[in-house]
């Protein structure tokens, strides 16, 4: 049973009438451009065919009823006439409440809604299940009430909800790609202007995501430290962000910087350049060059930004040994565990899966999870 059929069926059972619309918003994987988002740089994600699906219908009052199919059909209910505050027990409900609350601040011309939510974006794998939920809820209200909001505004609304209502710091990439993703394309995003450019993906290439299942413990504290180090670097160059520093300017004075800050800055500057070049390599179907750029990105994250762990490095090495120069592989996400992403010719996927199954657990004691994805369409009706 598809997520659409599942949510429509649950909706009719729970609320006693059929849903009028079914909306989806996808998760994402970032192909290249790591920790560049909060430095006003470039990222190159694609939406994936794992998504959050919501069957819904407008109400003729100001009540919102939401059922979470993946949390034992828990039901949340709140009114648009009262101040929206956090739910005491249901964390999932706060993503919904936050999106609705921030949407009210943007455009209050919507009424009540009934929703049933289900998704298959793996949680805790760094594939943006939360952004996919935020964008899905925003799209529901935009579609049901014909709100004059574009994808970028729905994305910004989701980011605000996560930062200010849920209380998690995040950049804008995850929500933007979920809202604006294009089938068979990646999206080059300028995190300063929020400008986007669709980049066609070569035919016959699979997007493979492998979760190391190494439990991330340092990610919060280390993320904040990296952010501070980047801000220190920008201040040294008297620029608003590292986006504004050239590699030539850096090389001329690198010896004057604190050695650790210098390494962090070098990663951001080289990663930005790699990301822009990767977009044109992909567009030209040059998988060999894309693979080189992904390998350089991984080495930079390992040696300069120091956010990989041995388990992730092992996983990347196993994949690289199979694909050679026919594709690319690197860690993706915040670091200290999580996933690797690989661009692999479809005919090599079984060999990669077999090599990883035979070697990764033997070397690390952890069993991986393997996802084969397609670059998918952003949020909309399904």
From Swiss-Prot:
<dbReference type="GO" id="GO:0000287">
    <property type="term" value="F:magnesium ion binding"/>
</dbReference>
<dbReference type="InterPro" id="IPR019741">
    <property type="entry name" value="Galactokinase_CS"/>
</dbReference>
<protein>
    <recommendedName>
        <fullName>Galactokinase</fullName>
        <ecNumber>2.7.1.6</ecNumber>
    </recommendedName>
</protein>
<feature type="binding site">
    <location>
        <position position="223"/>
    </location>
    <ligand>
        <name>substrate</name>
    </ligand>
</feature>
<dbReference type="InterPro" id="IPR006206">
    <property type="entry name" value="Mevalonate/galactokinase"/>
</dbReference>
<keyword id="KW-0479">Metal-binding</keyword>
<dbReference type="GO" id="GO:0004335">
    <property type="term" value="F:galactokinase activity"/>
</dbReference>
<feature type="active site" description="Proton acceptor">
    <location>
        <position position="174"/>
    </location>
</feature>
<feature type="binding site">
    <location>
        <begin position="34"/>
        <end position="37"/>
    </location>
    <ligand>
        <name>substrate</name>
    </ligand>
</feature>
<feature type="binding site">
    <location>
        <position position="162"/>
    </location>
    <ligand>
        <name>Mg(2+)</name>
    </ligand>
</feature>
<comment type="pathway">
    <text>Carbohydrate metabolism; galactose metabolism.</text>
</comment>
<dbReference type="Pfam" id="PF08544">
    <property type="entry name" value="GHMP_kinases_C"/>
</dbReference>
<keyword id="KW-0067">ATP-binding</keyword>
<keyword id="KW-0963">Cytoplasm</keyword>
<keyword id="KW-0808">Transferase</keyword>
<keyword id="KW-0418">Kinase</keyword>
<keyword id="KW-0460">Magnesium</keyword>
<keyword id="KW-0547">Nucleotide-binding</keyword>
<dbReference type="InterPro" id="IPR019539">
    <property type="entry name" value="GalKase_N"/>
</dbReference>
<dbReference type="InterPro" id="IPR006204">
    <property type="entry name" value="GHMP_kinase_N_dom"/>
</dbReference>
<dbReference type="InterPro" id="IPR013750">
    <property type="entry name" value="GHMP_kinase_C_dom"/>
</dbReference>
<dbReference type="InterPro" id="IPR020568">
    <property type="entry name" value="Ribosomal_Su5_D2-typ_SF"/>
</dbReference>
<dbReference type="InterPro" id="IPR006203">
    <property type="entry name" value="GHMP_knse_ATP-bd_CS"/>
</dbReference>
<dbReference type="InterPro" id="IPR000705">
    <property type="entry name" value="Galactokinase"/>
</dbReference>
<comment type="similarity">
    <text>Belongs to the GHMP kinase family. GalK subfamily.</text>
</comment>
<feature type="site" description="Transition state stabilizer">
    <location>
        <position position="28"/>
    </location>
</feature>
<keyword id="KW-0299">Galactose metabolism</keyword>
<dbReference type="GO" id="GO:0006012">
    <property type="term" value="P:galactose metabolic process"/>
</dbReference>
<dbReference type="Pfam" id="PF10509">
    <property type="entry name" value="GalKase_gal_bdg"/>
</dbReference>
<feature type="binding site">
    <location>
        <position position="130"/>
    </location>
    <ligand>
        <name>Mg(2+)</name>
    </ligand>
</feature>
<dbReference type="InterPro" id="IPR036554">
    <property type="entry name" value="GHMP_kinase_C_sf"/>
</dbReference>
<dbReference type="Pfam" id="PF00288">
    <property type="entry name" value="GHMP_kinases_N"/>
</dbReference>
<dbReference type="InterPro" id="IPR014721">
    <property type="entry name" value="Ribsml_uS5_D2-typ_fold_subgr"/>
</dbReference>
<feature type="binding site">
    <location>
        <begin position="124"/>
        <end position="130"/>
    </location>
    <ligand>
        <name>ATP</name>
    </ligand>
</feature>
<comment type="function">
    <text>Catalyzes the transfer of the gamma-phosphate of ATP to D-galactose to form alpha-D-galactose-1-phosphate (Gal-1-P).</text>
</comment>
<keyword id="KW-0119">Carbohydrate metabolism</keyword>
<dbReference type="GO" id="GO:0005829">
    <property type="term" value="C:cytosol"/>
</dbReference>
<dbReference type="GO" id="GO:0005524">
    <property type="term" value="F:ATP binding"/>
</dbReference>
<dbReference type="InterPro" id="IPR022963">
    <property type="entry name" value="Galactokinase_bac"/>
</dbReference>
């Amino acid at each position: 049973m598809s997520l659409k059929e599942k949510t429509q069926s649950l909706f009719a059972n729970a609320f006693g009438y059929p849903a009028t619309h079914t909306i989806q918003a996808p998760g994402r994987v970032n192909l290249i451009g790591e920790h560049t988002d909060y430095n006003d740089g470039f990222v190159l994600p694609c939406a994936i065919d794992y998504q959050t699906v919501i069957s819904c219908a407008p109400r003729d009052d100001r009540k919102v009823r939401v059922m979470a199919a993946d949390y034992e059909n828990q039901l949340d209910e709140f009114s648009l006439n009262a101040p929206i505050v956090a739910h005491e027990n249901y964390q999932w409900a706060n993503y919904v409440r936050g999106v609705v609350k921030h949407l009210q601040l943007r455009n209050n011309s919507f009424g009540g809604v009934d929703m049933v939510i289900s998704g298959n974006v793996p949680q805790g794998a760094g594939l943006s299940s939360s952004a996919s939920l935020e964008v899905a809820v925003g799209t529901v209200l935009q579609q049901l009430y014909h709100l004059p909001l574009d994808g970028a505004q729905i994305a910004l609304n989701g980011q605000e909800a996560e930062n200010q209502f849920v209380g998690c710091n995040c950049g804008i990439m995850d929500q933007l790609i979920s809202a604006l993703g294009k089938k068979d394309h990646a999206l080059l995003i300028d995190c300063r202007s929020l400008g986007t450019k669709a980049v066609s993906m070569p035919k016959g290439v699979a997007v493979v995501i492998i979760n190391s299942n190494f439990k991330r413990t340092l990610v919060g504290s280390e993320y904040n430290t990296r952010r501070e180090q980047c801000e220190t670097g920008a201040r040294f160059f008297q620029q608003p962000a590292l986006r504004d520093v050239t590699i030539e300017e850096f090389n001329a004075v690198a010896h004057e910087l604190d050695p650790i800050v210098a390494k962090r800055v070098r990663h951001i500057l080289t990663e930005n350049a790699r990301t822009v070049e990767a977009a044109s390599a992909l567009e030209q179907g040059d998988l060999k060059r894309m693979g080189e750029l992904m390998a350089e990105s991984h080495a930079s994250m390992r040696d300069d930004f120091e956010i990989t762990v041995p388990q992730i490095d092992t996983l990347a090495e196993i994949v690289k040994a199979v694909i050679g120069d026919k594709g690319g592989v690197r860690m993706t996400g915040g670091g200290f565990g999580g996933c690797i992403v690989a661009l692999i010719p479809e005919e090599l996927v079984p060999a990669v899966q077999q090599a990883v199954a035979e070697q990764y657990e033997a070397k690390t004691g952890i069993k991986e999870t393997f996802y084969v994805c397609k670059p998918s369409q952003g949020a909309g009706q399904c």
